[in-house]
């Protein structure tokens, strides 16, 4: 009787898990619930496998932040999503990008700023700005260093062991938006031997939250971030780096900040073949806008030429 009860419970769990998976236009999802980690708070990991996934082939890997927002708008808090399966699926079907899988790393909503705010920038900020950001934005202790370390030392080894990947840097990428864009470029700078490129959509270049942006906070925090990039960006034209922004809602803040970052990219010697900054008129700080243009950075990172 206990054996049958255990079987029923197991089957029920599997059915519930399947019901909670995103509905997809292309491919399939394998979910690891509460991935075991010593570095950050456990979270779900969604692994997207393309149509006709073949275990005898090897695949590039794209790590994407805010994983619960990637695939199915009916499952997200704001009923919008990136529709990443649609974008990747169509590009793969047309033979325009390398064979790849997506590893969607869920955020922990109350930890999102702590995980995504580049930690070495926080460490360099003076008082009282530092305390203000820690209290009102981070809401505790920063954890970005552990978050990127988690990806590199715990999650990536697991993915490379359990899926047929191409583990080298030139086949390993990160994509994120807003704060997810910040942690993507930070991860590349901290682990240049692990990642071959990043795409930072609507990167939150002021760093401070919109509620905290004032003349002093803005000047110090964004300036410290640019100082960090000056010192830590990988050698020019060894990695692919993509930035973009719109001009509506939150994105309306970004042009002056991004212009200063672009000057750094030029001064470091990055050329248009491996670095892009694009502006999108009429686009906003939303998953709807990111979904509309996701094919552009994906083609940039994974083009099959």
Residue ranges of predicted features:
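Non-catalytic cap/lid and distal C-terminal segments of serine-dependent acyl enzymes
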Residues: 19-305
